[in-house]
């Protein structure tokens, strides 16, 4: 079966693995998924991400992060712009998530970045997802 929304699939896999406190998960790789995973690592939501070559499209292995008492670092993930309904934001309309406690992933002409980075660079784009 053809996957219509690979980004939503990746976010769902992260959400599900996080709910049962798995240490790591694997998703089929793509350029945008790798950018999103690297961004989540930079923002401290996941511990590590590595690319594994498999002579097809590759695999991203994502290592989840948990707090001192095994509490979840990622409390929520939500896909915003979907294939059936794209959501775009101008530079001055980039949304804040939980008054800055979470991040919005924005796909711009300069790559995938957080809402904070998009505001600093004064660039808009497609609002991919919210993470908090």
Swiss-Prot record:
Where is it found, in Gene Ontology cellular component terms? ribonucleoprotein complex; ribosome
- A single GO molecular function term of this UniProt record: rRNA binding
Q: Which UniProt keywords apply?
A: Ribonucleoprotein, Ribosomal protein, RNA-binding, rRNA-binding
A GO biological-process term: translation
Q: Which NCBIfam families match?
A: PRK00136.1 (NF001109)
Family stated for the protein in its record: Belongs to the universal ribosomal protein uS8 family.
Question: What is its quaternary makeup?
Answer: Part of the 30S ribosomal subunit. Contacts proteins S5 and S12.
Q: Which PANTHER family match?
A: 40S RIBOSOMAL PROTEIN S15A
Q: Say what the protein does.
A: One of the primary rRNA binding proteins, it binds directly to 16S rRNA central domain where it helps coordinate assembly of the platform of the 30S subunit.
Which protein are we looking at? Small ribosomal subunit protein uS8
**Organism, scientific name:** Bacillus anthracis
